[in-house]
Design a protein with these regions (language model features):
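Structural boundary micro-motifs
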Residues: 1-156
Length: 156
């Protein structure tokens, strides 16, 4: 029905209408066709590219979300993961995880510390005390300087 009138469609037209209604917008994370290029974070943390051949390595990268058609997006992810590992190591070397985590406030352009209740579990590194979290902010700032990056270059 369209505007109250019944419209007869051929099977081909019906299929086209169904495809138009259910078509999914492609994202950078969709699986590529054979021989199309995608980007991934290599063992050394560097973003590399390869053509999808349908090999086991392609399946593994796609399955664990290490597969993206947008190089810039993957570079940001690689930088984010590197910073997160640096902060995780710092946390482990300084008392381990805890109720404190650090965050960057884009609105004010500065870092903050947030304390969470013990029953809240966060993704990413946490810190055992406010003092250690303050030191972690300095570690993060140093990492940004050493890599000639700003928080806006890394965080999504």
């Amino acid at each position: 029905m369209l505007n109250g009138q019944k419209i007869e469609l051929t099977p081909e037209q019906y299929q086209e209408v169904c495809n138009a209604v259910t078509s999914k917008k492609k994202t950078p994370f969709d699986r590529k066709e054979k021989d199309e290029t995608y980007y991934f974070i290599d063992n050394d943390g560097i973003v590399d590219s390869v053509k999808d051949r349908g090999w086991v390595a392609d399946d593994l990268r796609y399955g664990n979300a290490n597969y993206c058609s947008n190089k810039e997006l993957m570079v940001r992810r690689a930088d984010y993961e590197a910073l997160e590992r640096v902060l995780w190591r710092f946390s482990e070397e300084n008392g381990g995880g805890g109720a404190y985590f650090i965050c960057y406030d884009k609105k004010i352009g500065d870092w903050a510390i947030v304390k969470t209740p013990a029953y809240i579990l966060l993704l990413g590194p946490t810190f055992c005390s406010k003092a250690i979290a303050l030191r972690a902010i300095e570690v993060a700032k140093e990492w940004f300087r050493e890599n000639d990056l700003k928080p806006e270059d890394v965080f999504f």
